[in-house]
Design a protein with these regions (language model features):
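Generic enzyme active-site microenvironment
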Residues: 10-12
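Basic nucleic-acid-binding interfaces
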Residues: 1-7, 16-85, 90-101
Length: 101
């Protein structure tokens, strides 16, 4: 049996279609998704990337994605790609560019 690991979910949405369908800025849906992911144990790391705060089973992450689809049906027509990755060691490199974390 595999041990639980932190998981990363990344996705890409068709922002043009979102703006046409949602009657406004695509930022609204991204803000709502961020809140949803936060409520479900994921931290926003950048753009459309989220990492689980704690180790979890892949089945739990998949259930979160299913709930995300239910909460935001527009995703069924606007998701261009979505990936789930098991996170190993992570190293913060932002400081190499003179940016404080």
């Amino acid at each position: 049996m595999r041990s639980e690991r932190r998981l990363q979910i990344i996705f890409d949405l068709d922002t043009l279609l979102l703006e046409q369908t949602e009657k406004g800025s695509s930022k609204t849906i991204y803000t709502k998704i961020k809140a949803f992911m936060d409520e479900n144990g994921f931290d926003h790391i950048e753009y459309s990337g989220y990492v689980s705060r704690e180790p979890m089973m892949v089945a739990i992450a998949l259930a979160v994605v299913e709930s995300l689809k239910d909460a935001f049906p527009i995703l069924n027509s606007t998701v261009q790609g979505m990936h789930l990755t098991e996170v190993g060691d992570t190293y913060e490199l932002t400081n190499l560019f003179g940016v404080d974390d």
